Amino acid sequence: MQSRLSPIDVVFPPYNASQLEDVLRPRAARGIKEDALDDAVIPLCAALAAKEDGDARRALDLLRISVQQAEQSESEQVGINHVRQAQNQLEFDQITPTIQNLPLQQKLVLFSVIINEKNGLSNISTGEVYGTYEMACENAGEKPLTSRRVSSLIQGLDMAGIITAKKTSRGRHGMSKRINSCLPPAFDALQVMSSAEPVMNEVIEGRYRLQNRL
């Protein structure tokens, strides 16, 4: 099954799912053999892109990569599973360079969030992140930043869409943040960080005294 779909560089306004289907269908008719698409593929590509940001380029990328996934698996028809694979690939392709290019100190903060989540925590407090971060800095041979500076790095990760950090009131103890990662479930952020920053291997292999909540 050969495809003549190729990446394009065109500026589109945000579209809804129905409009995105109208964009995809003529492209598919020109570039993909008849009967090579499951009927649900174009509606799914359109719905996923509309839910994300309404960008027609994303819808076209989803369709193109779905076809590539089908070709690689030697499938006779592009199916929903290929669209899901394409969605994962796009997410990974978008987030990987962002994680790789984080400064070391911000990688250490992100590591501290992830390792606490792996320990079963969610809605992690700023203090819990900072305590783990101090241990991570020790394993990396780095001097820890102040808690105020780390709070700023957390905010940067939030703005980048890597984590969520929602402010909550602790009454007379002031404000805190409840922090969770936003990474795709199958995305191995630790591997990405260690490949970009070799010292992260020492951090990942280090020992940590992590908190458990009753």
Feature-to-residue mapping (PLM):
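Short alpha-helical segments that sit at the start of domains
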Residues: 92-123
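P-loop NTPase nucleotide-binding module
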Residues: 23, 51-54, 101-104, 108
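A short helix-turn-beta junction within AAA+ P-loop NTPase domains corresponding to the substrate/partner-engaging
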Residues: 1-14
